[in-house]
Structures are given as C-alpha cells and as structure tokens.
Amino acid sequence: MRPPGARRVATAVLGTALLLLPQACGDQEKGYCSAMSADQKVFAEMQDDPSGVGLLTHRSTLHDLGDRAPDDLRDEWQTFLGAVDAFAKTLDQAGVQPGDFVDGRPPAALSAAERTRIAHAASELASADVVEAADGIEQQAKDVCKVQLGL
C-alpha cells in the first residue's frame, strides 16, 4: 500500500518534468545550432575537398556535433559517423594518413589489397544508409539551424 501523498508527489514530479521537457529540448537544439554556426569554416573546408578526406581531418569536430545533436538526429549521426570512423580505421590499418592522398588518390606504395580495402571503406561513405543519414543531418541544419553543411 502506498503512502497517502505518494500519488500527489508522483503527479507533481511528472507534471514538472513535462513542463520542463520542451525547454530542455529547445536548449539542446539551440546549443546544437550554435555549434553548427560556429563550425561554418570547417564545413566550408569539407565542401572544398571533393575527395572526402576532409571528413577525416575534421572527425573530432563532427563527433562533437554528433554528441550535441538533438535526440531526433542521434541515429543519423551514429550512421554517418560510423562510416567515417570505419574509413579512418581502414586507413590507419593500412598505415596511411588522410594527408597522404593526392587529389583523392591513395599513395602509390599501397598494395592492391590495401587499395581495395580502402576503396571499399570509402564506398561505404556513399552507401544509401549513410547518404540518407547525411541528408537528414543537412536538412535539419538547413531548416532549423539555417546552416548549409555540404556533407
């Protein structure tokens, strides 16, 4: 049996939580949009790099944004960053850095097997799931944050 005032306390706590929820969501979105706006130079650099290597160069910034993303974008960021991280891991395993690529081409010293692995990991960045996730992130940035990303 519950104490007599327990239901009133639970109702009051739930009511307060529901009143604060829109503000918390708004604060999260506002912080995310502020971070997006502050990182405009990074997005411009990524847009100017057709090879996609800029995504790796600015991975920590992308992870910071993903961590700040509103709840309704978490899945998109997870999918997008998962592909970027997998590509970075493949490069690391091959012993190359993003800066080792010239005009989007891998270093000549790589074996055929390493080139194939890198090409496969890079192609994952253009997979339907990753493109859909990036499109969702960009659309939200454009509509809500008024920011153009160019992912």
Question: Where do the protein language model's features map onto the residues?
Answer:
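Sec-dependent bacterial lipoprotein signal peptides
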Residues: 1-23
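Short, flexible coil/linker elements and helix-boundary hinge sites characteristic
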Residues: 4, 92-95, 146, 150
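Bacterial signal peptide processing site
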Residues: 25-28, 146
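Ser/Thr/Pro/Gly-rich low-complexity linker/stalk segments immediately outside membranes or between
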Residues: 27-35
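Alpha-helical segments in soluble extracytoplasmic regions
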Residues: 39-99, 115-117
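C-terminal amphipathic alpha-helix
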Residues: 39-47, 103-151
